[in-house]
Amino acid sequence: MSGNKNIQKFRGEVSREDRENIHGHRAAVFWFTGLSGSGKSTIAHAVEKELFDDLMRVYVFDGDNVRHGLCADLSFAPTARTENIRRISEVAKLFVENSTVCLCAFISPLLSDRQMAREIIGDNDFYEIFVTCPLEVCEERDVKGFYKMAREGKIKNYTGISAPYEAPENPDLIVETDKETLEESVTRVKEFILQKVKI
């Protein structure tokens, strides 16, 4: 939030509700959290394609992509990770005002950071999806070798190895990617989203 009292929000002629009615669905943020390699981005992008094919306004905010632009100046230190989540949350909130279903795929390992995201976006527009998978399976999926480098000490502050991951306490949906196929996960997530955004 800006500390400058001379800056005030401007409300235009078109409301969020007007946009949602035109597009035939509510906007909301579906926040995918889980270890690297758990399947967050894969599921989010597959769901995005299906919803897009159904003519819905939908967009994936992917951790790697955001790090190339909006948050390219940030490190992976704890304070920088928090700022990363704060920026993403503020942008996602703007997309919600534009009647877009936002699929945010970020490790976001700390409970406090995810709570901050919920508070920025608004409790009524925020749904937490816990994409869970055993660490050893995530490591097996790691084609880039980041887990191996983290275990060798070549990468610092790597979630699950040298930095903590705090699992959600009460997620809105749990997806166990070691126990179901990608198609099953995508179907469950899509059905959950459609239930939440129907008008």
What is each of the regions a protein language model found here?
Residues 60, 126-130, 172-174:
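Conserved beta-strand scaffold positions in the cores of enzyme catalytic domains, especially
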